Amino acid sequence: RIIIATFASNVDRVQQIINSAYKYGRKVIIEGRSMVNIITTASELGYINIPDNTLIDISQMKNYPDEKVVLITTGSQGENMAALSRIAASIHNKVAIKPGDVVIFSSHPIPGNEKAVFKVINELEAKGAHVIFEDTHVSGHACREELKLIYALTKPKYAIPVHGEYRHLKRH
């Protein structure tokens, strides 16, 4: 099985995972409360396209061979009650790690979360999973040139930075 932990809010990343799973004939399971809520809403609003017969309920996962399943889950930051943390700690009621499972973290730990993330990684590897967590992160934030392009296209009267470190906000 392939298990991918990502931010529920990164709908584009989830779409990429679904597209790849579909291309290779894998069924997709969405797990984690926020992941289910956001992807359901994104699908209803047309922000994400899930091909017919690709998405299955987690209860159906046991009906498919491991090599035909991709589980997209919350928990990329080691959050205690996120689905991946519960899976790693063997307290998830529907998923248990099997030797040979591939678990991909699609983001770097946010500063301050490293200890929790590495705890989850260690628990997964101790259960026989192959964990991929380096060189998988692609920022969801626009770079300087992308911001310039957005401003050029939209020509806003005002631009107010609202997220980031003070030194970055000041330069913006």
Summary of predicted features, one role per range:
Residues 1-172:
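Acidic/His-rich, metal-assisted hydrolase cores and their charged scaffolds
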